[in-house]
Structures are given as structure tokens and as C-alpha cells.
UniProtKB/Swiss-Prot annotation:
Gene Ontology biological process terms in this record: translation
Source organism: Rhodopseudomonas palustris (strain HaA2)
InterPro entries: Ribosomal_bL28/bL31-like_sf, Ribosomal_bL31, Ribosomal_bL31_A, Ribosomal_bL31_sf
Described function: Binds the 23S rRNA.
Keywords assigned: Ribonucleoprotein, Ribosomal protein, RNA-binding, rRNA-binding
Protein name: Large ribosomal subunit protein bL31
Organism domain of life: Bacteria
Gene Ontology molecular function terms on file: rRNA binding; structural constituent of ribosome
């Protein structure tokens, strides 16, 4: 295997939306960094039965709805 071509693989802390933390290894960030999740399996509508609304982060959902609002409408 070639040396010095692989990214640094180190320990980080992942913080779930409910505050739960766990340790894992990743190439993200630096050793000891915390990765705060906005959506995780406990809060994502796909895994919770869709009872919660998806956050409109940066207006993306609004732009999509505006762009395709008339796509399936019949005249």
C-alpha cells in the first residue's frame, strides 16, 4: 500500500439532536472534534414515521416548491 496518500483517520465525538454523544473514528475534522448533527435517525421523518417536519435549511425546500409548484397541475 502507498504511504501518505490516505487521509488521517482519528477519533471524533458525534452529538445527536437529543444531546447523546458517542465516539467513532472518522476522516472528518481533527482528533477530538465534535460533530453536531442537525438530523439523525431519532429525528429524521423517514425513520420516525414522518410525524416531524423537515427543516427548511437555507430555503432549499421553499425554492424547490416554488420552482415545481405547477409541475403536476392539470389545466
Amino acid at each position: 500500500m502507498k504511504t501518505e496518500i490516505h487521509p488521517d483517520y482519528h477519533n471524533i465525538t458525534v452529538v445527536m439532536t437529543d444531546g447523546t454523544e458517542y465516539q467513532t473514528r472518522s476522516t472528518w475534522g481533527k482528533e477530538g472534534d465534535k460533530l453536531n448533527l442537525d438530523i439523525d435517525p431519532r429525528s429524521h421523518p423517514a425513520w420516525t414515521g414522518g410525524t416531524q417536519q423537515v427543516l427548511d435549511r437555507g430555503g432549499r425546500v421553499s425554492r424547490f416548491q416554488k420552482k415545481f409548484s405547477g409541475f403536476l397541475k392539470k389545466d
